């Protein structure tokens, strides 16, 4: 006679059932992060496609911005709300639109809709990488790396306009609209001379350089056990085993630079560190611009240029260009302010 002693299995609740369904092995993994990711990504992308196809920016910027009005892929945009809307969330049922969808689109409600759903969609994608990394049993460095573009998006599209007078000063969602925003950043903030922008450029271009060098080096050092192997004959794209030589790569770069990465972990961490840190730094810089913190100011050069008509530097030239951008862009970009600049206040070069 056998007596089995044990606990009765606990009754499965709705959480366990939902957890099983969300984590089921399927073609497109859903997961708990998918509850945030998929609806937000769908609504953000759908809102952008709807706005660029049908919705005008006439009421907010005095511009045509949709395919329906004759724009193309590079010139369509979902524009920011009017300056008079301040930092209102512009909810469809809010006091501005009062449930009128057409009025909501005219006021720029699609922009806040896309910006907020886009931000949460990106966060959901990062959480998806965390979740799958945990289930697969790998480290979460992909998710950590993806925090960099999220930081840039949030700082540029949300934090910067929150530091200014309204959502109006954020970028509109479109290619040409982003270019206009870059000119705005340069003219009003001298962004290219900001050290955080410099670190961002160094990170992005440095990351691209590292990727090119790394890919080329791996291709250069492919090998195959056996005789007569060359780089192009040695490798089968479907083979399982690793077939490149870290030792050979180390020897090559040691001869080129006199220094080389000694192991793969440090090499790949550096490739992660450079672009991610650059993007984080640029995001910090944009937060500074939201607070209207200034870039480098070389006052001594400005004073000397003002006193001496023959003294000019690239720095003082750029300041004149920035003044020109402001003088042109403020009346064009903010027609509601009714700016009028007399001839005598417009920028001139020292030689004039």
UniProtKB/Swiss-Prot annotation:
Residues involved in chlorophyll a PD2 binding: 197
Lumenal membrane side: 54-108, 161-193, 289-352
Chemical reaction(s) catalysed: 2 a plastoquinone + 4 hnu + 2 H2O = 2 a plastoquinol + O2
Any Pfam family matching the protein: Photo_RC
Binding site for a plastoquinone: 214, 261
Co-factor: note: The D1/D2 heterodimer binds P680, chlorophylls that are the primary electron donor of PSII, and subsequent electron acceptors. It shares a non-heme iron and each subunit binds pheophytin, quinone, additional chlorophylls, carotenoids and lipids. There is also a Cl(-1) ion associated with D1 and D2, which is required for oxygen evolution. PSII binds additional chlorophylls, carotenoids and specific lipids.
Entry-linked InterPro entries: D1/D2, Photo_II_D1/D2_sf, Photo_RC_L/M, Photo_RC_L/M_CS, PSII_PsbD/D2
Binding annotation for chlorophyll a ChlzD2: 117
Binding site for pheophytin a: 129, 142
GO biological process, one term: photosynthetic electron transport in photosystem II
Binding site for Fe cation: 214, 268
Domain of life: Bacteria
GO CC annotation terms, alphabetical: photosystem II; plasma membrane-derived thylakoid membrane
Catalytic activity, EC: 1.10.3.9
Membrane-topology annotation of the record: Multi-pass membrane protein
Localization terms from the record: Cellular thylakoid membrane
Keywords: Chlorophyll, Chromophore, Electron transport, Iron, Magnesium, Membrane, Metal-binding, Oxidoreductase, Photosynthesis, Photosystem II, Thylakoid, Transmembrane, Transmembrane helix, Transport
PANTHER family noted in UniProt: PHOTOSYSTEM II D2 PROTEIN, PHOTOSYSTEM II PROTEIN D1
Subunit architecture: PSII is composed of 1 copy each of membrane proteins PsbA, PsbB, PsbC, PsbD, PsbE, PsbF, PsbH, PsbI, PsbJ, PsbK, PsbL, PsbM, PsbT, PsbX, PsbY, PsbZ, Psb30/Ycf12, peripheral proteins PsbO, CyanoQ (PsbQ), PsbU, PsbV and a large number of cofactors. It forms dimeric complexes. Part of a photosystem II (PSII) assembly intermediate complex PSII-I; crystallized from a strain deleted of psbJ, it forms monomeric PSII before addition of the oxygen evolving complex. PSII-I includes 3 assembly factors not found in mature PSII (Psb27, Psb28 and Psb34).
Misc. comment: 2 of the reaction center chlorophylls (ChlD1 and ChlD2) are entirely coordinated by water.
Family: Belongs to the reaction center PufL/M/PsbA/D family.
Protein name per Swiss-Prot or TrEMBL: Photosystem II D2 protein
Organism the protein comes from: Thermosynechococcus vestitus (strain NIES-2133 / IAM M-273 / BP-1)
């Amino acid at each position: 006679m056998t007596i089995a002693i044990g606990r009765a299995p606990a009754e499965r609740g709705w959480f366990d059932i939902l957890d099983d369904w969300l984590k089921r092995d399927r073609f497109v993994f859903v997961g708990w992060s998918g509850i945030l990711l998929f609806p937000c990504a769908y609504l953000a992308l759908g809102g952008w496609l709807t706005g660029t196809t049908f919705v005008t920016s006439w009421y907010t910027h005095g511009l045509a911005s949709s395919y329906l009005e004759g724009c193309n892929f590079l010139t369509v945009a979902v524009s920011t709300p009017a300056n008079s809307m301040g930092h209102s969330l512009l909810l469809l049922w809010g006091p501005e639109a009062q449930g009128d969808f057409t009025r909501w689109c005219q006021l720029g409600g699609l922009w806040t809709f896309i910006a907020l759903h886009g931000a949460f969609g990106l966060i959901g994608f990062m959480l998806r990488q965390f979740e799958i990394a945990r289930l697969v049993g790998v480290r979460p460095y992909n998710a950590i790396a993806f925090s960099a573009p999220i930081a840039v998006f949030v700082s540029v599209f949300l934090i910067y306009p929150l530091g200014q007078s309204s959502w109006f000063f954020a970028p509109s969602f479109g290619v040409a609209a982003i270019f206009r925003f870059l000119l705005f950043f340069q003219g009003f903030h001298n962004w290219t001379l900001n050290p955080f922008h410099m670190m961002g450029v160094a990170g992005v271009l440095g990351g691209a350089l590292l990727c090119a060098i790394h890919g080329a080096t791996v291709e250069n050092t492919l090998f195959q056990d056996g005789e007569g192997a060359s780089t192009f004959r040695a490798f089968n794209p479907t083979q399982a085993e690793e077939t490149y030589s870290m030792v050979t790569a180390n020897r090559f770069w040691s001869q080129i630079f006199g220094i080389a990465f000694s192991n793969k972990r440090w090499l790949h961490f550096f490739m992660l560190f450079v672009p991610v840190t650059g993007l984080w730094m640029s995001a910090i810089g944009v937060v500074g611009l939201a607070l209207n913190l200034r870039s480098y100011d070389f006052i001594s050069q400005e004073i000397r240029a003002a006193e001496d008509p023959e003294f000019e530097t690239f720095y003082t030239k750029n300041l004149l260009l920035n003044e020109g951008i402001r003088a042109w862009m403020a009346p064009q970009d903010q027609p509601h302010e009714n700016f009028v600049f007399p001839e005598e206040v417009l920028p001139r070069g020292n030689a004039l």
